[in-house]
Regions:
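Extracytoplasmic soluble-region selector
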Residues: 1-174
Length: 174
């Protein structure tokens, strides 16, 4: 016969990182946008903790809530033993958009072609709404969800705005 060996309960290699290092939150604002990526196969978040539960609370699923003004550290403890932390600053004011990314400066569409714009706001906890506007809706139309549609040949600008920040996209329809 042949000899078979098996390793049971092999140690997990501690890898992984959070999508943010720090976030602002308004008092009573919650966010579930903090996530862990790059985990080793089989690794998972075992617990979430807050360094000061009077300032920031965090649920078992990683939903973070600002309770009162101040700073606290939220830590995700992985099954592999690795700890990942971020700083949460709780403020009284609305969380404003500091930048808009994830959009190209130039796009080309065919007539009747559609494309969904997916702007990424920084910080991820921004409370300011995103709005969209076309400089010429006869050439390129845009709806409130950021879906642009090529209407006829030509070019127009789409303005993506959140708070005082804006991003311009030049769209050419062929």
């Amino acid at each position: 016969g042949t000899v078979q060996t098996r390793t049971v309960g092999e140690k997990l290699s501690p890898t992984g990182k959070l999508n943010v290092k720090r976030i602002p939150l308004k008092i009573r604002q919650t966010t579930s946008k903090v996530s862990v990526s790059g985990l080793a196969n089989g690794d998972l978040v075992k617990t979430w903790t807050s360094s000061n539960r009077k300032i920031v609370s965090v649920s078992k699923k990683g939903v973070i809530k600002g309770l009162r003004k101040g700073k606290a550290t939220v830590t995700a403890v992985l099954a592999s033993g690795k700890k990942l932390s971020l700083t949460v600053t709780v403020q009284a004011k609305t969380v404003k958009t500091k930048s808009i990314t994830g959009l190209k400066g130039k796009l080309t569409l065919k007539r009747k072609g559609k494309l969904a714009l997916k702007p990424v706001l920084s910080p991820i906890t921004s409370q300011e709404k995103v709005s969209y506007m076309s400089s010429n809706s006869k050439i390129v139309a845009v709806n409130k969800r950021g879906v642009i549609t090529g209407k006829k040949k030509g070019s127009a600008r789409i303005t993506v705005k959140s708070g005082s920040k804006r991003k311009l996209i030049r769209v050419t329809v062929r």
